[in-house]
From Swiss-Prot:
Subcellular location as annotated: Secreted
Protein name listed in UniProt: Trypsin inhibitor STI2
Membrane-traversing stretches: none
Disulfide bonds: 66-81, 102-132
């Protein structure tokens, strides 16, 4: 009986010595984060009256998420995301629509876009002469 107890204790210590470090290593290794199929595209757009974002307080703000599907508080997220995709995310490349007639009254409106577009940080600010000029750009991106 003594030899059996000694043999069992030796076997248990050997198993612990061999398997113990493996168990600890498995517990210490963090699980890999699953890779996303889509690069993040989430933006916050604001509009306010003034010559710059620093001088204007935002009148309205909306969110726009474009991946994997268009969503957010923007009134037309699918169209706004399509506008951005059409210019490869380059907001400066958005042009005014043809045939829009605006008055020359100077009442500056500033628009900001901050967030991430296809995994890249975006920080954009533009001042338009008035609300009509702002609405003539980017068929739906700035229409909120």
């Amino acid at each position: 009986m003594r030899n059996t107890a000694r043999w069992a204790a030796t076997l248990a210590l050997t198993a612990t010595a061999v398997c113990g470090p493996l168990t600890g290593a498995a517990l210490a290794t963090p699980a890999a984060a699953p890779a996303s199929l889509y690069a993040p595209s989430a933006l916050v757009l604001t509009v306010g009256h003034g010559t710059s974002a620093a001088a204007a307080s935002p009148l309205r703000a909306v969110t726009l998420n474009c991946a994997p599907t268009a969503s957010g508080t923007h009134p037309a997220p699918a169209l706004a995301c399509a506008d951005l995709r059409g210019v490869g995310g380059d907001i400066d490349a958005l042009k005014a629509r043809d045939g829009v007639i605006c008055n020359k009254l100077y009442d500056p409106v500033v628009v900001t876009v901050d967030g991430v577009w296809q995994g890249k940080r975006v920080s954009y600010e533009r001042t338009f002469g008035n609300e009509c000029v702002k609405n003539s750009y980017g068929t739906s991106l700035f229409a909120f």
